[in-house]
Amino acid sequence: MSITLSRPSLSRPSLSRHPSLTLHSSLSHAPPHHRPVAFLRHPTLRYHHHGRLLSVASAILQDTAIRQDTYIWTPVPISRVLPAAAESLFKVIVDLSRSPDLVYNFVSPGQYVQIRIPEAIVNPPPRPAYFYIASPPSLVKKNLEFEFLIRSVPGTTSEVLCSLKEGDVVDLTQIIGRGFDIEQILPPEDYPTVLISVTGYGMSAGRSFIEEGFGANKRSDVRLYYGAENLETMGYQERFKDWEASGVRVIPVLSRPPPNWNGAVGYVQDVYLKDKPIADPRTTGAVLIGNPNMVEETRGILVAQGVSREKILVTQD
C-alpha cells in the first residue's frame, strides 16, 4: 500500500522520504511518516509438515505479514459537501451518529483516518486516501460529525468525495496516530510564544489544533504562518477573524499572489525569519504541519535558535 506525496508549491522542492506511502496531491496534509497499520490479534500457532510447533515469534511474524494492510472499516454517511474556496476546495462532512467508536477515539488534533470509496459508488474505486480530521475533538463530541478539508483532484478519492451527496456512504478506518503532544507546550504561562506553521491542506489539522484550544489568549505571542498558492486555495479564511480574536495572529503567505496582494509572499519559513524575533527560545513552542520540506527546514531553524526539539510538535504515529 502506498501513498503518493506531491510537492506543494509552498516549500522548496524535495523528494519524499517515505516511499511506502502515496498521497494524492490534495492530501499534502496527511502525515508523511505514516506507515500501514497492522492489527495483530491472538496469533495462531502453526505446525509445519514435520509436526513441530513453530515458535510463537515465527507465528507472530506470519500473522503480521498476513495482516499488514488490515484496517477496521466503518461505513458512514455523507452529511454535507460544501465549497471551501474558489478553486476545487471543499469541506466534506460525515455523520458519526451511528459510529460511537470513531467519536470516542478521536481525542487529539492531528489524528487522521483513511477513507475508502465503496464499489457501489465507483467501480473500480480509486485508491483509499488519508485525511486529517479538521474538526476539533470537543466539537466532534457535540455534533457527532467529522469535517475534512479536501481539494478535488481528478481520478482520485478526493474527486469522488467532493462530488458526493447527502446520504452517500463511504468507509472510514479507525482513528490513526496520536496527534499533537500538546502537553509539551502547557501551561500557557510557561510557553508564551507559540509558532504554528502550516502549508496547503495541512490546515485541516491546524484548524483542529487552534479551535480545540491551547490557551492562546493566555500567551503573549501566538502566530499562524499559513502558506498556500493563492487565496483561491486557502481554506478557512472565514475563520481568521475568530482565530485572531482567540489570540492567534494569522499571517497568510502566498507563493503565487495576485498583483494587488500586500501580504507575505514566498515560503512560510522565510517569512518567519523576516518577522520579529522570538522573545526567548526556552519558552517557545511550535506546531508544524504540511509539506515535509517545510517541516524539516522550520524545525532546523528553530532548533538553531535554541528552541527545544521536544517543544516543536508534529503529528505522531
UniProtKB/Swiss-Prot annotation:
Q: Which residues does the UniProt record annotate as the domain FAD-binding FR-type?
A: 71-182
Q: Which Pfam families match?
A: NAD_binding_1 (PF00175)
Cystine residue pairs: none
**Domain of life of the native organism:** Eukaryota
Which residues does the annotated region (Disordered) include?
A: 1-29
Kindly list the GO molecular function terms attached to this UniProt entry: oxidoreductase activity
What InterPro entries does the database record attribute to this sequence?
FAD-bd_FR_type (IPR017927), FNR_nucleotide-bd (IPR039261), OxRdtase_FAD/NAD-bd (IPR001433), Riboflavin_synthase-like_b-brl (IPR017938)
PANTHER family, A to Z = F9L1.8 PROTEIN (PTHR47215:SF1), PTHR47215
Protein name, entry field: Fruit protein pKIWI502
Source species taxonomy: Eukaryota, Viridiplantae, Streptophyta, Embryophyta, Tracheophyta
